[in-house]
Structures are given as structure tokens and as C-alpha cells.
Amino acid sequence: MQKLRSTSTHLILFKKSAQLLLALLWIFYLFFPKSLIAGNLSSLSHLIGNQDAILVGDPTGRVIFSKNAQKKLIPASILKIFTSLVALHFLGEGHRFTTDFYMDRDSNLKVKGYGDPLLLSEVLDEISEILITKFESIRDIVLDDTYFQHPIVIPGITSSFEPYDAPNGALCVNFNTVYFKQNNNIYVSAEPQTPLLPFVLPRIRQSALDRGRIILSNEKKETTRYTGRLLQYFLEKKKVKSKGKIKIGRVLKEKDTLIFKYVSRYSLKHIVAELMEYSNNFIANQILIASGAKLDPPGGTLKKGVRAGHFFAKKILKIDNFSFVEGSGISRKNKISADSMHKILKKFKAYHYLMRHTDREFYKTGSLKGIHTRAGYIRGRKGGLYPFVVMINTPGKTTDSIMARLLAALG
């Protein structure tokens, strides 16, 4: 009997020891790899100066390494990740921008824009194919861009000819840019789908460039008028007689007749993918302003867009300490911490596949003079996504050496 009790006791002790060993092995499995990764990442610390920050999370969202994570820094274009989330929240990933076409009693064609960021030459060409089934001739083309405030002044935007300074508006085409080159000393279009209209030649000559992509000006509503000129070109190419002028005006819904509503072929999710790929400042602020108009209708202003951003940051992401003045990241007045960017990345994880990517990294970069940033996700050896934020606000430094070590540590 005594021997039986002894055997039973040994079995109980063995089971408890086995359970303890399994628990220790489980803890080791859960935490040792992360501790090892954190140890590897600690070598990055000396690369992060007082005006820089880094944060790395694990696939569950837990922070495994950080330095200066609470410091508010200039994010540059990684801010577009946040702007995309704002638009996805207020507009919905399936949202499609619209443009309305009316006829008034005097046979004037009226066009009302609602901020479509991907209204392109080929789209206007397709629209004209539909419009020619509605009429054979028109008088004036009247352009209604009143859905957005005019002008919209974006902090950080200058009056240069560079595409990143393109102005925003409710009725714009080709990102408010013109792409040209010279052929036998004559200016011609540099893209087959877009004619080079005489309307833009003074602006091209003013740029003093032989070739390139320049922006149109907001002065005298040049950007809006260009949309009308391009539409007129495509209509006349299809033998529609245009007897009048290109004018700025308003649609009178109680008097004018809606003859066609163009619904964009591109969903907002597609637009966000384009934004992540090309980092277009114009697109970023178009979707921000449209988000503001959704939150506080009718009509879009930058102020409403910024308000929508702050609302989303505070109520949805629980971010309070955030300086947000526009959606593209071009303004140095935008400031955010790596910790707040981590919250943004956790929310954007469901859309990570919309970002630029290599074999292991999904990412968005940002750069201004003296500023280099990078944020996204690195796929670990077990397939999980590790969110990361690197913000370098020290002039003369880049993210290159940091990213090389980060990829190696998580490889």
C-alpha cells in the first residue's frame, strides 16, 4: 500500500513537472523570439538622434522596440496613410466620385464637379462619347466648381510649376497638370491621350522648360477652364458644334436638366492604391476635402477636411497629440509621434496590400528638405506583419541604414 502511494505521488509530481516544463516552453516560445528580435533591434538605437524616432511592433500590435516614440516630428508623405484612413472611414472603400452634366433652356452644357481626383483625359473622351448621343450642338460650356471652396490654400504649397504643388478644386482634370515636350522646336503633348491645347501654351512658355509636367494655376480659375477646354476638344473631335464660350457659372437644379451623371470607374480603394504608389499630393487633399464635405455637408473646404481628420484621430484612433493642417504631408506644420503613427498602422493593416511592396516589405516613404520618413509593415520569418515607423528629422540623414538593419533583424 505504501509503495502504491509512493508511485502515485511520483506520478503527480511528474505530471506537475511536465506541466511546468510545458508552460515554460510555451513562455519561451512566445517571448524569447520577440526578446531576441528586440535585442537585435537595440543596435538601431545609436542611429536615432534627438530629432528622429523609431517604433517597431509585433504582429499582435505590441511594441517591441522604440526610441523617441512620443516625440512629435514632421511625417512628410507617410501622413498619406492617415489621410487614406480618413477617406475610407467617411466615404467608404466603394465610394465613386461623380461629375454631373446638365443642359439649360438656352442649350448651354453645364458641368458640375464634385472633386473627382481621377478625372483624366481618357475619361473625358469616354464621357464625350455619351454626351454626343444627347445633343448635336451646344452654345456655351458652363463650368460649376462651387462644390469646393475657391481658392483652396494648402499650407506648404507654393506657386511653383512642380506637380507636387498642384492646386485643388471641385472640377479638375489630369491632376491639374500638363505633360509636354518639344518636337522640332514646337511644343507637343508628351502623352497620346491628351492634346496640347493652345490654352496652355502661355503657361508652358512661362515655365521656360523644354519638356516635363507642369501645373496649371488657380488664378482666373485656369484649372477649371482647362477642364472645359479639354471637354470642348473631345466634343468637337466628334463633330459636335460648339457655338459659344467656356464660362464659369452655376448649375440651377430647379431649371437645368440633368442629361448624364458620370460615376467614376475607380473606387476609393483604387484611388488609395494610386495614392500609395505615386504619393500624389493633389489626390491626398482631394479625398480629404471630400471627406470633410461628407462629415459637414454641403460643400468641401480644407477646414472641414482637417476637422474630419481630427475627428477620426480622436474618436476612432484615440490620438490626441497631433498637429494636422492638410492631408498630403507637404506642410511642415503637420507633426505626429511614432506612437500615433503606430496606431494608424494598426488600423491600416487591413489595407496594407494597397501599399508599395517588395518581397517582405509594404511601405510608404516621405521626404522634404532635411526630412526622411518610412512606415509600413515587414513580413517576419513566420509570415506575420511587423508594423514599423522610422522618422528622421535630422538634416543629412536618411532611413537607408536603419531599414537595412531592421529588415535583417526581422528576417
Walk through the language-model features, giving the residues of each:
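Conserved serine DD-peptidase/penicillin-binding transpeptidase domain
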Residues: 41-42, 89-319
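N-terminal secretory signal peptides that target proteins for export/translocation
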Residues: 1-15
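Active/ligand-binding-proximal structured segments within catalytic/core domains
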Residues: 73-87
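C-terminal soluble interaction/assembly domains
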Residues: 323-411
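Intrinsic disorder/low-complexity segments enriched in small, polar and charged residues
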Residues: 15-23
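Extracytoplasmic
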Residues: 49-51, 78-79, 96, 106, ...
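Bacterial N-terminal signal peptides
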Residues: 22-31
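Beta-lactamase-like hydrolase cores
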Residues: 36-72, 91-94, 130-137, 409
